[in-house]
A protein has these predicted regions:
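Short helix-initiation/N-cap motifs at beta->coil->alpha
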Residues: 76-91, 105-108, 180-187, 260-275
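Mature extracytoplasmic/periplasmic domains
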Residues: 50-54, 62-65, 118-119, 286-293, ...
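Extracytoplasmic/periplasmic substrate-binding proteins
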Residues: 46, 60, 64, 248-330
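Conserved N-terminal structural module of periplasmic/extracytoplasmic solute-binding proteins
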Residues: 6-112, 116, 128-131, 297, ...
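Alpha-to-beta junction loops
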Residues: 93-104, 118-120, 195-199, 275-283
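Hinge/lid segment of periplasmic solute-binding proteins
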Residues: 105-159, 370
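Short, solvent-exposed loop/beta-turn-alpha elements that line the ligand-binding surface or hinge
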Residues: 123-137, 141, 178, 201, ...
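Helix-loop-helix "hinge/cap" segment bordering the ligand-binding cleft or interdomain interface
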Residues: 65, 144-214, 222-261, 271, ...
Length: 385
């Protein structure tokens, strides 16, 4: 898993998306890729948790309405945060049996494929002038790490969110907007642990991505964006003490998470925030998709979010996209799907359910709700993304 950072310029949003994973098949044989190829569209993805699975189905429903003759072969890769998808896809590509398309973070995560010419240039077939004009410019740049457009971004997630149960914090007398930096959050955890019966922070340690994500926000909150960008750029000289400090604070945080953290998924942990058994959750804003689908759990009155302490003004982002592998078993169906994924209709259906904002600027925000509309304003006003 790559280290997530603030996206911008040519740097990718190659952090981690959520999901508890589910076992899927290891792929299906495609056609020979000649002419239109197979009418089966095989999609490898990792969207298997409740809210994200609903969003994925909303995307497929819209595609089926426009292309009812295409048979979709749904192939979720097992493992949280896409932890298994690279192995699955790379093995398939090496064996000459690529899927029709697969989910991937644009930016640096694409380079192992573009370096080996394993992705088709879709600059003419998919990225027409209307689509290019509608997309946010820095997101378009992520789709062409080697110059040619090879991916279609479909969403933008923010990672440095600190979600909380409003009534739990009200009862404890905690104002999350007053928390002063990552160290201040530890003090709040200590207070909650000593004075209440709730778990201070919902969290999973079954797979490492949630803790890595949390460490990144701690580091940015303590040291700032410039130090973080230096670190992920490979220049670690002079940052050893800063890295150790963030790791120590992460270890301190993990004293205040659920006892069963090692056996649960992120969304199972998030249920504790919904039920009032946990106060906080550090997670990407896909967590909001779960809140949206919960009964009688409303934004601002029941749950809310502040930027992780110390990271106000930073939109630490991760973006999902789909690509067109070379040797494609279903070139016509894949092109149709990528065209749809980049459309207003697809992004209007998918993102409100997913808990993400659209990379197109012309998607109506009416169905996104107050939280995602606020996130979109945060994105536009952030000084680092």
């Amino acid at each position: 898993m790559g280290i997530a950072g603030c996206s911008g310029g040519g740097d990718g949003g190659d952090g981690s998306d959520g999901g508890d994973g589910s076992d899927g098949s290891d792929g299906s044989d495609g056609g020979d890729g000649s002419d239109g190829g197979s009418s089966e569209l095989e999609i490898i993805h990792w969207w298997t948790a409740g809210g994200e699975q609903d969003a994925y189905q909303a995307l497929l429903d819209g595609f089926r309405e426009e292309h009812p003759d295409v048979e979709i072969v749904d192939n979720p890769a097992p493992g949280g945060a896409g932890s298994a998808i690279d192995t699955v896809v790379q093995n398939r590509v090496i064996d000459g049996n690529p899927p029709s398309t697969f989910q991937i973070w644009p930016g640096q995560a694409l380079t192992p494929y573009t370096d080996e010419d394993l992705l088709e240039d879709i600059g003419d077939s998919v990225w027409d002038e209307e689509m290019r004009d509608a997309y946010l410019g820095d997101v378009v740049d992520l789709a062409r790490p080697a110059g040619n457009l090879v991916a279609v971004p479909i969403n933008i997630h923010r990672l440095n969110n600190l979600f909380y149960n409003v009534s739990v914090l009200d009862d404890a007398g905690v104002d999350p907007t007053d928390i002063d930096g990552p160290e201040g959050l530890l003090g709040v955890f200590e207070t909650l642990d000593a004075e209440t019966d709730v778990t201070p922070m919902a969290h999973q340690t079954q797979s490492p991505w949630s803790s890595l994500q949390l460490w990144e926000s701690i580091f940015i909150g303590e040291q700032g964006v410039d130090a973080f960008q230096t670190l992920i750029g490979g220049d670690v000289s002079g940052l050893e003490d800063e890295v150790r400090s963030a790791l120590q604070l992460l270890a301190d945080y993990l004293q205040y998470i659920p006892e069963d953290a090692g056996s649960i998924s992120w969304d199972q942990g998030n249920n504790d925030v919904i039920s009032g058994d946990a106060a906080f959750l550090h997670q990407g804003d896909w967590a909001a998709g779960q809140y949206r689908s919960a009964e009688d759990f409303e934004f601002e009155s029941d749950w809310d979010m502040v930027p992780f302490p110390g990271t106000s003004g930073v939109y630490q982002s991760v973006i999902d996209s789909f690509v067109f592998p070379t040797g494609n078993p279903s070139p016509e169906a894949t092109e149709q799907f990528l065209n749809y994924a980049g459309s207003v209709d697809a992004q209007e259906r998918f993102n409100p359910v997913k808990g993400s904002i659209p990379p197109r600027t012309d998607v109506p925000m009416d169905e996104f709700g107050d939280f995602l509309s606020r996130q979109f304003e945060f994105w536009k006003s952030s000084n680092c993304r």
